[in-house]
């Protein structure tokens, strides 16, 4: 195994491409907040590494729901596998995976297993970029994640692009007795003053494990 260590700010900012979504769509943070607004507070949430987890952590901290989330810091692509494992052993609970386009692509095959979990909701925020590395583009320009999800076995798969659609599909997902996949199209970028979690990952893991036992 080889590891390449790179200093912070080593990457130049990526130049926008044709597929970069126009400003008429929600930012990922606003889309995430819209999702959160329609969730029960006690639903377990597993979030992918990077900016999405940092945005979710701010929302959780504000609403005192930090215990309900496992942030997969440094575990890109593994959120859905962890969510699948939890869904398997907590079949009476709805389990939510909050994923990114690059992360979902990294371990795409895992969705063949996650699709079988009837209590799982899998949401992919697709902004056609890796925001945590200056917006580098993953090779997803011609990929429709919701179509792939359907082929991989999800009972229902949707693509949404605005608040109303997000609200409708979240409500549908919470009532569904089968697996649901939602692709949310959103814009690139994040707030420059976005904070990081205050505690270490072990702390949040233990809090989440205690939450699951309730």
Where is each model-derived feature located?
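A charged, well-structured terminal subsegment
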Residues: 1-2, 6, 154
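A structural signal for short, well-ordered beta-strand segments and their strand-loop junctions
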Residues: 3-5, 46, 181-183
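Glycine-rich beta-alpha junction loops
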Residues: 6-12, 49-53, 127-129, 185-190
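Active-site pocket-lining segments that scaffold enzyme catalytic pockets across diverse folds
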Residues: 8, 15-48
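SAM-dependent methyltransferases
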Residues: 10-15, 21, 43, 202-214
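Phosphate- and divalent-cation-binding pockets in alpha/beta enzyme and binding domains
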Residues: 13, 54-56, 81
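Thiamine diphosphate
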Residues: 29-34, 38, 58-213
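Acidic-glycine-rich active-site phosphate/pyrophosphate-binding loop
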Residues: 44-65
């Amino acid at each position: 195994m080889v590891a390449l260590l790179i200093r912070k700010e080593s990457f130049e900012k990526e130049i926008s491409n044709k597929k970069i979504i126009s400003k008429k769509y929600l930012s990922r943070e606003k889309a995430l907040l819209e999702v959160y607004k329609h969730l029960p507070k006690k639903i377990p949430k597993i979030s992918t590494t990077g900016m999405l987890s940092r945005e979710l952590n701010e929302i959780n901290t504000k609403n005192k729901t930090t215990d309900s989330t496992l942030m997969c810091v440094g575990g890109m692509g593994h959120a859905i596998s962890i969510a699948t494992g939890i869904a398997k052993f907590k079949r009476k609970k709805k389990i939510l995976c909050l994923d990114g386009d690059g992360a979902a692509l990294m371990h795409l095959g895992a969705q063949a297993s996650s699709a079988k979990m009837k209590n799982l909701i899998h949401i992919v925020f697709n902004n056609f970029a890796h925001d945590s590395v200056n917006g580098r583009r993953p090779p997803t320009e011609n990929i429709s994640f919701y179509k792939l999800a359907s082929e991989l076995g999800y009972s229902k798969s949707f693509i949404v692009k605005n608040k109303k659609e997000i609200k409708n599909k979240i409500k549908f997902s919470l009532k569904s007795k089968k697996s649901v996949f939602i692709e949310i199209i959103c814009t690139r970028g994040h707030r420059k003053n976005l904070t990081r979690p205050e505690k270490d990952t072990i702390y949040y893991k233990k809090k989440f494990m205690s939450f699951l036992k309730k």
